[in-house]
Amino acid sequence: MNGVAQDKVHGLEQTTQWNQQASQKNLTNNPAPKAVTGFKLDKGRAYRKLNEAWPVYEPLDSTKDGKGKDKDGWTTSGASEPKGDAPLVSSTESQMAAVTDSQQSGHNSGLVSLAQRSTTVAVQKSDSSGSQGQGTTDNKFQKYLNTAQALHQMGVIVPSLETWPGKPSTGIATRAGGGVSVQAATRQSSSTNEDLPNVITQLYHTSTSQLAYLNGQIVVMGSNAVPSLWYWVVDERTTSGRATWWAHTELNWGTDKQKQFVENQLGFKDDSNSSLTNFKSQGLTQPAYLIAGLDVVQDHLVFAAFKAGAVGYDMTTDSNASTKDQALAWSTTAGLDSAGGYNKLVENTGGLNGPINELVYPARHLCLCDPGEWDERGESE
């Protein structure tokens, strides 16, 4: 799951244009165009429920066949091939019952150990209509990483794939500062068939360096395991099963979907004519913050953070504008290997390794007193 540089994803011919845009917006020393992103997502949600474990995180390996197909190849043959390629895995009624018991016993307010709410559930691969898909019977992945296998390779616990011959899974993340080992919680659902571990929760819990749980919400701090260092709030009780992360987003790199991607990350949209791709339409109204630390104090989630500006992309809605389809994809990533690294990013002395639209926000301490409402409490002592 090693990432590749943006110029490999978009094509070498885009390098000059990225550099020109960076210069115009004073985004010097941004990680463009060599920013590394671990994978790209195309056509649909950034995750699927574990019983929809195909298709695909499409790993980027700069090839035109097998993994990392180009867009045209993916939309024609690639979209159907993972269905028959992924291993066949089944689930059991006893495991489903374990999920229900875990949910009923673990739903209380305040800081809850997610380990108390975790469960072991096998994966059943099915298509969007719910029917059993075809696939290999040797529990091996042939051509593509399906969702469950991609998560497993990143260290996410998918119990039925623990024997899959891939990268060993770490399985458990430790919340920094508190020494609390946690596992992913299950998603609340009225349907027994839907009582499966929340994939997005697992992805977050594995790919983050810090995590806290409060009043049914999981708040995390990203790391270089995902293409961004933004935080997101994941509500376990979302009945639709959609996460707030990249909801309703297509990432066809090199198109205006890059602009949509940035809009989704920042939680706002400059074109009010369509809100389907905006996080606000999904109930996430908090502004984006980069987080320096997380903790829970007296049932309040407290973290050190600074408010992110409008990360440099062209906000024009003019379809004829030359920058509309560029959207500065490099601004969506913050490589930890770039100059200054994580400390500069947190301190915000140079914005995203460079000024964010020439604005620099001071570090602040913020408190989530009620889910969805931010209260600035000033600097900590």
UniProtKB/Swiss-Prot annotation:
Coiled-coil region: none
Disulfide feature: none
Protein family membership: Belongs to the MgpC family.
Biased composition (Polar residues): 13-31, 89-109
Pfam families, per the entry: MgpC (PF05220)
Biased composition (Basic and acidic residues): 40-51, 61-73
Organism of provenance: Mycoplasma pneumoniae (strain ATCC 29342 / M129 / Subtype 1)
Name of the protein described by the UniProt record: Putative MgpC-like protein MPN_503
Region span, Disordered: 1-109
Stored InterPro entries: MgpC
Domain of life (superkingdom): Bacteria
